[in-house]
Amino acid sequence: MEKIFFNYPFNKGKLKTLLIWSILNTGQYNMINLVENLKKVGFQYATTAGISLGIDDLKTISTKYDLIEKTNDNIKDITNHLNLAVLNEVEHSQKLINSWQKISEILKININKKFKTVNKLNPIYMMAFSGARGNISQVRQLIGMRGLMADPNGQIIHLPIKSNFREGLTVTEYLISCYGARKGVVDTALRTATAGYLTRRLVDTAQHVIISQLDCGTKQGIFLSNLYQGTDILLALKDQLYGRVLGKDIKINSLMYLKNQQIDDSLSILLANHLKRVFIRSPLTCKASNSTLCQLCYGWNLSHSKLISLGEIVGVIAAQSIGEPGTQLTMRTFHTGGVFSGNVKSQLYSPFDGIVEYSSSLYGDIVNLYNGNFAFLVKRKGLIIINPIIKKIKPKKFEAILYTLVFVKNNEKVKKNQLIAQQSNKISNTQQIEGKYTVNSKLEGEILFDENHLSTNKKKIWILHGKIYKSVFPLQLFPKKNDFLSYKFPLAQAKLLNLSASFLKVCVVRKKRHFIKDNISQSNEILLFTEYPLYKFLIKNIKNYHQFQFFYPIQNKIKEVEKSLRINNKVIKDNRIKIPFNSIAKSKLLNLLNKRLEQNTFFSKNTFSNYYENTDERTTWFTQNSILKYNAIYFYKSSKSVEAKTSRKIPITFNSKNFLIKEKLFFIKNNSVLLPIFSSDFFTKFTLKNEYFKPKHNIQRKLGFLSPTSYFKYISNNYFLKYLNFYQKHISVEMNDIIKVKLYYKQEFEEKTNFKKQNLHKIDSKINLFMNKLILVIEHLILTKLFSTKINNINYLLFYFNYLKYLKESNKFTIFYCNKKKETIFDLLFLLKTLNTTSNLIILAENKISTKLLSEFIYQTIYLIKNNITINSTNSVLENFNYFQQRKEDLFQHRNIFEKVPNFSGKRFSNLSLNINNENYSISKAENKMLIQDLLTLTILNNNIKYFNSHKSFLDKRFFYNESLPIPKILKDFTSILNRINFWSFSSSQFYKKHFLFALKTDNLINIKNKNFIFISRIPQIQAVNFALKKSLKSSFDLKSYEILQYNLKFPLGFYSLIKMIIEERSLFDIDYFQKFIIQYKNFSFHLINKKLKNIFTNNSYGSFTDESTLLESKYFNKRRPTKTTFSKLMNQIKFKFFIKVPLLLSTFSKKDTVLFNIFITNKKENFRNYKIVNMLTNDFYKNLNLQTHSSEKNSQLKLSSKNLEIFNLFYTSSIINVIMKKSITNFNKNFFIDNLFQFSKTHFNWLPKWDTIVRIQFLSPYQGEIIAQNIVKYSGYKTLYNHLMILTKNEKLQVSIFRNKNQETIIKKDTKNYFITKPHCCKIYPKFGSLIYSTSQVSPGKKINQSGQIIEKSNSFLVLRKGTPLLSPITGIFYVWNGDFVSQGSPIMTLLYNKLKTGDIVQGIPKIEHFFEARKGNVDLIQTNLYIKLLAFFKKYNKTLSEYRAVKRSILKIQKIIIDGVCRVYCSQGILVSRKHFEVIVKQMTSKVKIVNGGETGLLEGEFINFQKLEKINTNLYHRRVVYEPLVLGITKVSLRTESFISSASFQETTKVLSQAALEKRIDFLNGLKENVILGKLIPGGTGLIVKIITNKI
C-alpha cells in the first residue's frame, strides 16, 4: 500500500476530518486501530523530543524597565494635571490605562521578536506559537509584565502589576492579582453547577420529543444561510446543511436534487457554493402529532451519519448536546483591557526616532476619540513614511488604509516605539455606549465655583476644606458666622417640656380581652422646644395668619392655675384636653346656602381607658370626694360661625347638609353628658348623683333634647349656645313626648312631598330607581331552613321609596311568634327610605329561631321599634303604628336623621327574648348566597344581653357579628351591604350618600362589659355602609349610644363603624370649601358624594374628620388645595425618630397630648389620626363654648375665657415629639386597647405641672475653630429646616511664608536688655486676598507653594491659605451641588458622561444562553433584547396585513430564528460547534403555545395557554366567533412547568402547587413522555430496538 505524505501541520481540525473519513470508509474497527496508532506515534515522538519547561527558558526583556520609567514620568504629569483640574477623573483614568496598555502591547511585540531572533527552539516559543499549549498573552505575563487587573466590580485598578512571573510579584501585586485567581476557582465551580441546571431544565423541556414516524408530510421548512458576527462568518452554511434533508427540489447546473434528499458532506459543499440560502426541513415545522418529530424533519443521527432511527429520544439528546458544552463557556468575563486596548495587529509603532511624512493622497477628517484625544481619520488610502533622523537607517513606508486613525501630525518628530497610527473599523453608534462616572468628594468642605473661569470651557469647581457641624434637630444655633468656637462650646440648647400636668406617664398597649395574649409596649413621649420665640403678636392683628407654618400658643396662666389646683386637692385637671384653637379656611367661592362652617373637635380616646395605679397605698393626691377629671374623653365641640350672613339664592330645603349639621350638635351634647361616667370608673368611692344619669330618665331625655335641637338649628346661628341651655333645663320627658317630636318636625319641614307606599306584589326582580339616584336594588335569594315553608325561596327587592311585601298577609307589619311563650310581638317597620320587605325582629328562644334572621336592605336600615310594651298591650302598639306611618311620610322626603326617633319607654321583654332598645339590626348583603349562621351563637348572645338596668347607668352590652362569612370584596358605586348582622344599640339609620363598601374578612363577637369600654370589632376593613347607618342615628341616640361613640372615636381603622358615622356628619358642611377631598381608606379610595356638593369628605379610617384638612405637604394653612391626604403621606412626614410638632398643630390639636397618643405607633400608617384646624382664631373664640361637665355632685363648668388666648407666641418649629423607649409597637392591630396608665409614685417629685421643663439639653461643638459659613438645609421628605455650620480648624489651614529663605524673616537681635526687631524688606505678594491659587502658582518672587486653596489672611510676612481641591467641571454632566453647599466626605459632586466602545457583551456564556432560553419578560436589559416584546411587535406588524393565523405563524418563525441564531453565536464565539437542529428541538417547545385573548364560542378563558396546533384545529371547526389569540414565547422553566404531563411538571419544580392545581382541574396524564413513565415504573415510549410480542400458550 502506497504511503501518503501530508505536507502540512496536523492539528485538531485535520485529525477530526481524518477520523470521520476513516469511520465512513473503513468502519468502526479500523478507525479505532488508526486512533491507537496515532496515540503511539504521538507519545513516542514527544518522549524522543523531550521538550521540558525550565525556569531558564524564561528569557526576560531588557527594554521593559526603560519603558516603565518613561511611563511613570508620564503618569506623574497626568496626575498633576488632575490636581490642577486640567483633566477630569474620567480623562485621567483613560490616560493612565492607555499608558500601561501601550507598554503591554510593545512588550508583546518585543517578546515575539526576541524569540525569533535568539532561539526558535525555545520550549516556550514552540509551545505557545505552535498552538500546543498557551498563547502569546500568557507568555507576556511570564516574561513581560502582567499589566492591568480589574477589581471585583470589573473596574480597572490603576496600579498595574509591573512584574512578571519570572521575576516574582511584590506583596501588593500579589494581592491585586489574587482576585483573578479566586475568580477563576469560583467560576469553575459555579460554571459546572449552572451548566448542570441548564441541562436539567432543557431535558425537562424536551424529554417527550421522540421520533415517531418517517414523514409527517409537511410542505413547510426553514431557510438556512451563513451565520455572521459583524462581517465575519461564525457558522458556515455547509456546516449547517450537513445531515439535514432538502425541503424542496433544487436545480443546480442541470442537476436536480429532489425534496426529502439527505444532504451529505459533498452535497452540503456544493449547495453552499451555489446558493446563499437553502430551504430544508426542520423540527420547527414538523407536523407529527403529540409534540413528536418525524425522521425526515429531523435528519441524520450525527453520531452515525445516517437517518435518525424511529423511537430515538431526540429531545434528551438535544438537551444534553446543548447543556454539556455549557461547562466550557465562561460565566462572566470582565474585559479588563476592553475599552482601552487596541487590536495588537492594528497598531503602528515607530521602529526608530524619526519624522513622519504623509503622502498627498491621504485624505480624511479630524475626529474626537472616545478617550478624549484627537486623531486624524483616513478616508482615502495613502502612505505613511517615517524618515529616520540617523541617516544610515532606511526610511520605512506603511500603507494607511481606509478608517486608519493617525495620531501624529505631518512632519512631526516621533520617538522610538511611539504610537503613530491604528487601524480601526468604522465605529457605529451601536458599538458605543455612554458611560457615567460619579465624582465623589474625597474630603468634607464647602463648594465654590471659580467665577474667573466661567467664560472659558475649562470651568473649575473648588472644594474648600472645612468641618461640617450638622444639627440633629431643627435648632436655632447661638454662634454666628466668624465666631470662634472652642471645643465643647454649647452651640444650641433645647429643653424638654412636660406636656401636661401629670405623673409619670406610660402608654400601655394591651390586646383586647378576647385575645389571650397581652402585648405590652411602653413609650415615653418627649416634647422638645427651642427657647427662641420668633414672633410675639396679638392674634387680633393677624388676618392672614395662614402664612405662618408654625403656630403655638403659650399659656402661662394655665400653669399657675394648675399649681393652685393641685394644692387644693379638690380637682386635678388634666389640661391635655384644652380646646385647640381652630382656624377656618375661608373661600370666596361659597355661594351655596349659608356660609357657615362648623368645626368639631373631638378629643376622645376611644379605646383608651384611663387607669390610675398607686404604687403607694396612700393616695396622697386626692381627697375622697375629689374626682380626677379626664378631659381626654371629652368631645369638645367648638363651633364657630364665620360670616354668618347668608347669601341664599335657593330656598332652604331640608337637605342632607343641614341635617348633618344638626346631627353634629347632638353628638356634641351627649359627649359632655357622658363625661362623668368615665371618671367614676376607678374611684369606687364616687357615686354619680347627677340627675341626668339616673337610669329612669335615659330614654326620655333623649327624646327631650332631640327635637329642639333640630328646631333651633334653623332659627339662629347661635343654636349651639341655645341648645346647651335648653339641654340644661330639660330633664325628663314622658312617653307622650313622641307626639311633641312629631310636631317639631312638622314645623321644621314645611315643604313636604308625600310619597305613597306602593305594594309591589307582582314585581319579582326588577330594579326600580327612584329619586336621588341613590337607589340600589339588590336581588337577594335567601335559602334557609329557618323559614316557614311558605317563604322558603324569596326574592327580596329593596326600593328607595317602595314597600315590597311578599307575605300573604297584607298587614303593614309582620307578626313573629316566639315559640316558647307564644307571645306576639309587633314589629313596626318604619320605612324611611326603604322598607325592607319584612322587618326582622329576632326573638330567640331556647336555641331556636322562629323567625327568619336575615333580611337585607340597602341604604336603609330596618327599624325594629320595640315599644318595650308587654305582650298584652297590643292596641297601644297599633296606635303608635299609625302615627309612625304618618311620620314616615313626613320624614321620607328629607333623607334625614330623624328616622331613629321612635323610642319608647316601658318595660323590657322577659329575659329570654332579646331586649332591643332602639336596637338596629343592620343586615348586610353579600353577592354570594347569604349565610345564615348557626343560630346557637345568637342564643348565647340573647342570654347575655342586658341593657340599662334600673340600677346601672353603664353599658353592659355585647355586640354580635356573624363570624367568618365568606364574602367577596365588593366595591360598587352604591352601597351593597355586606353579609353580616350587626346589633347596634341605636334605633336605626338611613343612607343618603353613596358609599363604597369593602369586604369584611372576619367579624367577631364583641363584648362590652364595662361602662368605659366600647366595642371594637376585629374587622380588617369596615364597611362604609355601617358608617352610613350610624350617621342617621343621631337624633335619637340614647346615652348608651353616645357613650359608645365617645369611645369609638379613636379606633384604628378596623373598628369604627360608629365613629365614622359621627365624624362623617360632623365634617360635612354646606359650603364648597375645599374643592375636593379624597381621603384614602386603607388602600381603597373612599368617596362620600353629596348630591349638590363637590365636597368629598371624612376619613373614617381614624374616626376623625379629615375632610377639610388641607394637604400637609403644602404650607400648612394653604386652604384652596384639593387634598388627597392619605394617611401614608402624613406618616412619611413624621417618620423619623421624633415627631415634629408642626404637623401636629395643624392637626386640630393644641393639645399635644392627645396627638401623642395617636403617634405612639410610628411604623404603622393606619394608626395615625389626621386632624385639622377648622375654626378661626379670634378673641371671642370661646364665648359660645359653655361646656357642661357633670362630675360628682357639683356642676363644675369648664369655661375657657378667650382673653388668655389673645396673645400668642409663634415658635420656630423646633418642637419635636420623641418617642423614647419604644418597644414592640411596630404592628398595631385593630384589636388593641390603648390604656393610659398613670402611675403615681411615692415621691412627690414625679408630679410635673404643665409646661415645666423636664431637662435642658445642650448641643456641644465637636471641633475647635472659626465658623466661616452657615447654611440652612431642608431635607427632602421633611418639612423643617436644619442649621449647618462650616468650621475651619487648624488642619484645614496652611500658613505660608512669603520669603524664600527662613533667615529672611523677622530677626530679633538681643542687645543687653533691649530687643531690636529688624523688618526685612517687603516682598510683593501676587495673589489678592480671597483669590484661589493652585499648587504650582507663585505667591511672591521666587516662592511657590505646593498646596491649592483660597487666601483668607494676608500680612507682610506670611499668607494663610484655606486648603482646597480644584476639580475640572465637565461640559456635559450632572451636578449635585451648588455654590456654597456643604459636602461631606464621599458625597457625590457631579456625574461625568463619556462615550466608550462596547467590549462585547459583558454577559457571556451561560447567562447569555439563559437569556435566550428563559425569554424573561421582566428583564432589566434593554427593550431591544426582550424577546417577548419583540415577538409582540412582529405580531402586530404582520397582523395588519395577514390573517391572525399567518401573522402568529410568521412572528413565531421570526422569533425562533432570533433565539437560535443568538444561542449559536454564543457557542460559536467560544469555539464550540453544536448542531442547529438541537436548538430547533428546544425552541419548538418554547414557541408551541399561544395565549388566548378572546375565547369566542369555545369557553376558553382569556389568558390561557393552549397548544398552537390544537387551537388551529379547533378554530377551523368554528364558524361564528373564532378564538382570538396572540403568540407566546415561554422560557424553558415555564415550559417544563406547563407540560401536558403534570407528573413531569411536578417532578421538576413546585411539586405541591403543580399537583394540587392538576387535582383541582381534574387533569389526566396520558403518559406520553419518558419522565412520567420512569416515575411510575412503566416502559418508556422510546428506544430503537424491536418490540417483540411474546405469546405464551395457556397451559
UniProtKB/Swiss-Prot annotation:
EC number of the protein: 2.7.7.6
Principal location class: plastid
Name of a matching Pfam family: RNA_pol_Rpb1_5
Binding residues annotated for Zn(2+), in chain numbering: 216, 286, 294, 297
Catalytic activity line of the entry: RNA(n) + a ribonucleoside 5'-triphosphate = RNA(n+1) + diphosphate
Cellular compartment(s): Plastid, Chloroplast
Cofactor(s) in the UniProt record: Zn(2+)
GO BP annotations, alphabetical order: DNA-templated transcription
UniProt GO cellular component terms: chloroplast; DNA-directed RNA polymerase complex; mitochondrion
Annotated cofactor note: Binds 1 Zn(2+) ion per subunit.
Keywords noted in UniProt: Chloroplast, DNA-directed RNA polymerase, Metal-binding, Nucleotidyltransferase, Plastid, Transcription, Transferase, Zinc
Secretion signal span: none
GO MF entries: DNA binding; DNA-directed RNA polymerase activity; zinc ion binding
SUBUNIT field: In plastids the minimal PEP RNA polymerase catalytic core is composed of four subunits: alpha, beta, beta', and beta''. When a (nuclear-encoded) sigma factor is associated with the core the holoenzyme is formed, which can initiate transcription.
Purpose: DNA-dependent RNA polymerase catalyzes the transcription of DNA into RNA using the four ribonucleoside triphosphates as substrates.
Entry's family note: Belongs to the RNA polymerase beta' chain family. RpoC2 subfamily.
HAMAP family assigned: RNApol_bact_RpoC2
Protein name: DNA-directed RNA polymerase subunit beta''
Organism: Bigelowiella natans
Gene: rpoC2
